[in-house]
UniProtKB/Swiss-Prot annotation:
Cellular component, GO annotation: cilium; intraciliary transport particle A
Subunit organization: Component of the IFT complex A (IFT-A).
Gene name linked to the record: ttc21b
Keyword terms: Coiled coil, Repeat, TPR repeat
Organism: Xenopus laevis
UniProt-listed PANTHER family: STI2 PROTEIN-RELATED (PTHR14699), TETRATRICOPEPTIDE REPEAT PROTEIN 21A (PTHR14699:SF2)
Coiled coil: 365-392
Sequence ranges of the TPR repeats: 4-38, 110-143, 147-180, 182-213, 214-247, 325-358, 493-526, 528-560, 564-597, 615-648, 720-753, 755-787, 789-820, 829-861, 881-914, 916-947, 948-981, 983-1015, 1019-1052, 1193-1226, 1228-1260, 1262-1295
Domain of life: Eukaryota
Functional description taken from the UniProt entry: Component of the IFT complex A (IFT-A), a complex required for retrograde ciliary transport and entry into cilia of G protein-coupled receptors (GPCRs). Negatively modulates the SHH signal transduction.
One GO biological process term: intraciliary retrograde transport
Family: Belongs to the TTC21 family.
Protein name: Tetratricopeptide repeat protein 21B
């Protein structure tokens, strides 16, 4: 039986629902080939004919099957329906059939009841169908197919509670994954509840089990569209066309995509023709299906003439086949869009003749009368229509034409805006809750919304909002009307153009430019786009770009030069470029144009001149004449403007311009007198008071009168808006406490205003009331529910280091179902980014996952932004770049440099931020990729903001490449410009030491001293001097200078750290080293030296009490130094305590060089050399970096010491050469090399190395002098040996050992 063939029955029922009557017949015929004479298939084949109005044919074919037990009820119902649709109704036959139906129903079986219920459901009689199916379920012991149909009946209900019950029937009725009809029902239930993933799973089950079942792919295509995933929607459409090259739904979707997303008229026309051909081929007798498939395209294409003409031809053809009022009205609507009001009026009249109660036809007639200026006739018709509508309620069309008529009759603004507002509410009520799809697009009707926006713009300010000026609520309303349209149809130029115009008037120039740029991309030839772009460029101060836009507009349409607006913009540009004469000439010529004459103004249409622009031309000319010294002529033009516009809302602008001219002449009092005459009930009163306030503040420097203007404004026009203006004014003059009081009063008047709540939060932060700010944000967020307040609160909590609270706030904001609207996605991405920041300080191990989620979401946003909200693109690219930087920084902390570099590179794809380039350069330096670092630094040297840091990094690169001259030159260039840049000088001193050129340092100190007489008092200068003395082997002088810097917030921490190191190791010995350990010190320090060292430890401990780190790195440094103090005591217990602390540090941070070195030093002091060696071997494999340079050098020297003690001179030599590679002044390395050569009895080489050690230690270490003199003695250079002995004894008279063992012998050897 066919009813067990899920493929055929589900397909037939699907096409019945979609009203694809020919498809139903075709599928039934296909089934009859397999199941010949099947009554169910025969019935559905006849049903398809009946729906095509082939009534007599259907009656004739129903007669043979009307008594079949399976289809007896549905066939009888179909016959009744067919007879009633006949031209001549056979009432006797109908009565007989109705009696038969009553009798048959009493004894009908489950199958008959099932198909009767199915027929009633398909005919739209759901409640009656429910009676039949409930009875069927009762007598069939709840058959599965009955349960499924019962689920469909509930799913078709308009009551949400009933729809929610449907899933229960589907779940109970689904026998297996082969019941396609049940699975489609379940998928549709999921779609109705926006559970798209659940719906997709079900649809995929059908596709897997029944690959040829085309409706499943169609549903999948609609499902992707509901998710706004156009890529997958188009891909699925193409899959459908591969299986069915004339698929109606696929071509409809492709046409809609071409119109709404691509803006390609050519592609849209091609797909539209394919759609028409598919309809003609697949559904030739289905005119109303043709209409309903074409109408969404007609609704979406706006005023695209080629598409409208094609649609008109199709609808005209449909009318010939089906002359219904609905078709006539659709054709009339199409002619309205084409601007052919006369033709439209004729078709609306035709619709009224066909159906006298056709309301859309009547409203269309009235609209045409208004557009043709027949206002009295329109008013009479509207009164009649209004009486009819009172019984059934208002419609959006009625509200709109009422507003249109009120506007043309010059009625009050409030009446017009109330009607427009109601029209918009009724319009969007029809689409609310609908998923994105064909029905949504048809009901969205962008052109209707544009008509409403045009009426709003007539009432809106005509000049862009000045900074600080309140935004007109009408502009807000107009923008909110268009936002959903631009979001789903970003290639429709008319909504984009008006969106750009609104944003321009609202002062959002970047947003306006983004929207308009999209318009130009879609249609480069529209001159109006270029004119508005010129206005935007002018407002941005981009005068060259403004001129280009004007000329581009002219190149596309030469008639642009006949528009006064073109000349106004051009004159303004000429004024800015100083060409006053040319600008005056341009505007004088403009005054003679037709549009500038009285009565020439038009209603707001594309590119038309409004009264505001006309006034602007007068005022611009007056200002130009004044600037050109033609004061009398300027006054005359102002007077002409007053004569023409006196008594209009624009008069106040002329008065304000008059006041500006007075201020420019220095007559402030006259300007104020002119402005004082403006009464509170006049237009622009708020702007006038703000102008007065600015004069008081800027010209009179009187803050009291400045605030007085805003207080008067609040008294005359009390409300939240004026209170906010007063609060902002108080903030402007640095009185946040008073501003807080005003903001709070305003919030009481308007508790739902989230922006006001944000102002209060910012004011609390400005007054350092952080706790109050947190409490306030928390309370405000609960009241308003605004997510951006969550972000503000989280940012504040992060600043206050209250990370757990920040996490809780952000998690709460993110605790919702996945969102698809762009605004919510942007908010979620921001919340995820902030959560990642929180975790970087709080739960480092989780931060990467969260930031990757944020990045993934940002990338989805970036795919949609260019089409939906192009003005957001720069900000969203920047946000994406910042998340990449956060991830890079995370991986730098983890020392995963390759991954970090990848994220920095990705960040630079989204934003060419030099700061990111600098961070990447720094990373390349850490990685040892010197060439990449050099390439990036070279580019950064051209950027003044980053030149200094780039030069320092480049110097580091040059140093590592052993190009010391170039390295020093780079630092020298910076210091030439700023000799007192001590941050650079400190790095240069280190570089000079490492390159063996420390002797050049004094000249830089001299330059700094010459720059200012106060240089010696500068902490930075003293720090640099301390560093120089320390490196020079003068620890006491170093301490003295560091001491002068230790109280400074910038230099103090490093100064104290260096002082502690000097106190603990004044002679710069190798801690833990044994090679140069004196025999008498083998068992510990004794006597005076011991006491001296303990004094150093105590001094270091005292200094550390002043060490107050603010960062985690600073706290780690403090812990390290404290334990170094313990280790310096050489007491076993203390050393073991220090070792434990060092080990813990090294374990928590596996690559912490200074901690690992300290562990090795502690082991050496405890005589656990093998363990020390293991740690030092680890460090020998660490790549050199400037940050770890000192500790790596110490580790290599200590490891060399170990190997020397073991007699492994080759390995030790390699380590020592590595030290000298990165520090030419490392005298300890030379000392060790001298020791190795001496032990190998190569006294000449030993003397050469000791000589370098002696020179680089500034000839201050007597032990090194002793070894040098000894090797000179051995090499028989007696004079040199004697010379060194004298130098040592002069500096250290208490060093008799050298006199006894070397000097005497050398002198004896010289004697003949």
């Amino acid at each position: 039986m066919a009813d067990t063939d899920h493929y055929i029955t589900a397909g037939i029922i699907y096409y019945c629902q979609e009203k694809y009557h020919q498809h139903v017949q075709n599928l039934a015929r296909e089934g009859l080939k397999k199941y010949s004479n099947d009554p169910v298939l025969q019935f559905f084949k006849i049903y398809g004919m009946l729906m095509e109005d082939r009534v007599q044919d259907a009656i004739r074919r129903l007669e043979p099957i009307k008594d079949d037990p399976t289809v007896v009820l549905c066939s009888t119902m179909a016959l009744i329906y067919a007879h009633k649709r006949s031209e001549r109704v056979d009432r006797e036959a109908v009565a007989d059939l109705e009696n038969k139906l009553k009798e048959t129903r009493k004894s009908a079986g489950p199958k008959a009841l099932y198909y009767a219920g199915m027929f009633l459901w398909l005919m739209g009689r759901t409640d009656k169908a429910r009676e039949y199916i409930d009875r069927m379920l009762k007598i069939s012991n709840r058959s599965r197919e009955g349960l499924v149909l019962r689920g469909w009946l509930d799913l078709s209900s308009e009551k949400e509670s009933t729809v929610n019950k449907s899933i229960r029937y589907f779940e109970e009725g689904i026998q297996d994954n082969k019941d396609i009809f049940a699975l489609i029902g379940k998928a549709q239930y999921f779609m109705a509840h926006q559970n798209y993933s659940g719906a997709l799973d079900v649809i995929n089950q059908i596709i897997v089990n029944y690959p040829p079942f085309l409706p499943a792919l169609t549903l999948k295509m609609r499902l992707f569209l509901a998710q706004q995933d156009w890529d997958q929607t188009l891909e699925t459409a193409q899959r459908i066309l591969l299986k069915d090259g004339a698929n109606i739904d696929a071509f409809q979707i492709l046409t809609i995509h071409s119109v709404t997303r691509e803006g390609s008229t050519e592609k849209a026309l091609n797909y539209l023709r394919e759609l028409i051909n598919a309809l003609d081929a697949a559904e030739p007798r289905n005119p109303m299906l043709h209409l309903h498939k074409i109408l969404p395209i007609s609704s979406l294409c706006g005023r695209n003439q080629p598409i409208l003409k094609q649609v008109s031809v199709v609808i005209g053809r449909i009318f010939q086949t089906a002359p219904h009022a609905e078709v006539a009205t659709a054709l009339a609507n199409n002619f309205i869009l084409q601007g052919n009001v006369t033709e439209a009026a004729g078709w609306y009249a035709t619709a009224m003749k066909l159906d006298g109660n056709h309301l859309e036809g009547l409203t269309g007639v009235i609209q045409c009368q208004i557009l043709q200026g027949q206002l009295e006739e329109a008013e009479q018709q509207l009164d009649f229509l209004h009486e009819i509508q009172e019984s059934i309620g208002g419609t959006k069309e009625l509200c709109y034409i009422q507003a249109l008529l009120a506007s043309r009759q010059g009625k009050e603004e409030q009446i017009i805006t109330e009607l427009l507002k109601k029209a918009v509410e009724l319009h969007y009520a029809a689409v609310r809750g609908l998923p994105l799809g064909v029905e949504y697009f048809e009901k969205l009707n962008p052109t209707f919304l544009i008509n409403i926006v045009q009426e709003y713009l007539v009432l809106c300010p005509k000049q862009p909002k000045a900074p600080g000026e309140p935004l007109s609520p009408l502009l807000k309303q107009a923008l909110s009307i268009l936002t959903p349209v631009v979001s789903v149809a970003p290639a429709l130029t008319e909504p984009l153009y008006y969106t750009a115009q609104i944003k321009y008037l609202a002062g959002n120039l970047e947003g306006a430019q983004g929207s308009l740029q999209r318009c130009i991309e879609v249609d480069t030839a529209c001159a109006d786009f270029h004119l508005l772009m010129a206005q935007i460029h002018y407002a941005q101060g981009k005068f060259a770009e403004c001129s280009v836009s004007l000329e581009t507009g002219v190149s596309h349409n030469f008639k642009v030069r006949e528009r006064p607006l073109y000349h106004l913009i051009r004159a303004r540009v000429l004024r800015k470029t100083g060409e006053l004469q040319e600008a005056i000439k341009t505007l004088k010529m403009t005054m003679s144009l037709q549009e500038m004459k009285r009565g020439a103004l038009k209603k707001s249409t594309w590119g038309s001149l409004n009264s505001s622009d006309k006034v602007s031309i007068y005022l611009e000319l007056a200002e130009l004449l004044r600037l050109n010294g033609e004061q009398h002529e300027a006054t005359k033009i102002i007077q002409d403007a007053i004569n023409e516009f006196g008594g209009t809302p624009e008069e106040i602008r002329i008065v304000v311009a008059n006041a500006d001219m007075a201020v420019a002449k220095g007559d402030v009092e006259m300007a104020l007198n002119v402005l004082r005459d403006i009464a509170p009930n006049q237009p622009y009163y708020t702007e006038v008071k703000q102008k007065m306030a600015q004069i008081y503040l800027n010209n009179r420097k009187d803050k009291k009168l400045y605030i007085g203007c805003y207080r008067e404004l609040c008294e005359q026009q009390p409300g939240p808006h004026t209170s906010v203006l007063l609060g902002d004014a108080l903030m402007n003059i640095q009185e946040p406490e008073k501003a807080l009081e005003v903001y709070n009063e305003a919030l009481h008047k308007n508790p739902q205003d989230a922006s006001l709540a944000n102002r209060i939060g910012q004011a609390l932060i400005k007054t350092h009331q952080y706790k109050k700010a947190v409490n306030y944000y928390e309370a405000a967020q609960k009241i308003s529910g605004q997510d951006f307040l969550c972000c503000d609160l989280a940012e504040l909590l992060i600043k206050l280091k209250q990370y757990s609270k920040a996490e809780a706030v952000l998690k709460q904001a993110l605790a919702h179902e996945p969102v698809s609207d762009l605004t919510s996605m942007v908010t979620d991405a921001k919340c995820l980014g902030l959560l990642g920041t929180t975790y970087q300080n709080y739960k480092k191990e989780e931060s990467a996952d969260i930031l990757n989620k944020a990045l993934e979401l940002q990338q989805r946003i970036l795919k949609r932004v260019p089409m939906e909200q192009p003005e957001m693109a720069p900000a969203q690219k920047q946000a994406t770049s910042e998340i990449c930087v956060q991830l890079a920084e995370h991986y730098v902390d983890q020392r995963n440099y390759e991954q970090a570099a990848n994220y920095y590179k990705e960040a630079m794809v989204y934003s060419q931020d030099s700061k990111v380039k600098l961070q990447l350069s720094r990373l390349y330096l850490m990685m040892g990729d010197l060439d990449s670092c050099e390439n990036h630094c070279s580019a950064l040297l051209e950027n003044h903001s980053f030149k200094e840091e780039a030069a320092m990094m480049m110097a580091d690169v040059m140093f590592r490449k052993q190009d010391y001259t170039k390295s020093i030159e780079l630092f020298d260039q910076i210091l030439e410009e700023n000799p007192d840049n001590f941050a650079v000088l400190s790095k240069l001193i280190d570089l000079l030491r490492r390159s063996g050129n420390l002797s050049k340092a004094p000249m830089f100190f001299e330059k700094a001293l010459a720059n200012s007489s106060r240089t010696t008092l500068e902490p930075g200068y003293n720090y640099c001097k301390g560093l120089y003395c320390w490196y020079l082997g003068q620890p006491n002088d170093g301490l003295k200078y560091f001491n002068k810097a230790r109280k400074d917030s910038e230099w103090g921490q490093n100064a104290i750290s260096n002082m502690v190191q000097i106190c603990l190791n004044p002679d710069n010995e190798i801690v833990g080293g044994e090679v140069f350990e004196a025999p008498d010190e083998a068992d510990g320090l004794l006597g005076e030296k011991r006491e001296s060292e303990m004094l150093g430890v105590r001094t270091a401990e005292k200094l550390l009490k002043e060490f107050h780190p603010r960062t985690l790195n600073g706290r780690n440094q403090l812990a390290l130094l404290q334990n170094h103090c313990l280790m310096a005591t050489k007491d076993k217990a203390n050393v073991e305590t220090a070792l434990s602390a060092f080990t813990e540090m090294a374990t928590s941070e596996k690559d912490n060089v200074c901690a690992i070195l300290a562990v090795a030093q502690a082991y050496m002091i405890l005589r656990q050399t093998p363990r020390a060696r293991n740690q030092l071997k680890r460090l020998s494999k660490v790549p050199w970096s400037l940050a770890d340079a000192e500790d790596l050098e110490k580790s290599w020297l200590l490891l060399a010491d170990v190997y020397i003690k073991l007699g492994k001179y080759d390995i030790a030599t390699e380590l020592l050469k590595r030290c000298l590679l990165y520090n030419k002044s490392c005298y300890k390395a030379y000392e060790y090399l001298g020791f190795i050569m001496e032990n190998e009895q190569s006294y000449k080489d030993a003397a050469a190395n000791y000589r370098l050690a002696w020179d680089y230690s500034n000839q201050s270490n007597p032990a090194v002098g002793f070894r040098l003199a000894f090797n000179y003695l051995k090499d028989k250079k007696y004079v040199d040996a004697i010379d060194i002995c004298h130098k040592v004894l002069k500096a250290h008279p208490t060093y008799p050992k050298i006199e006894r063992e070397i000097l005497a012998k050398a002198q004896t050897s010289l004697k003949p």
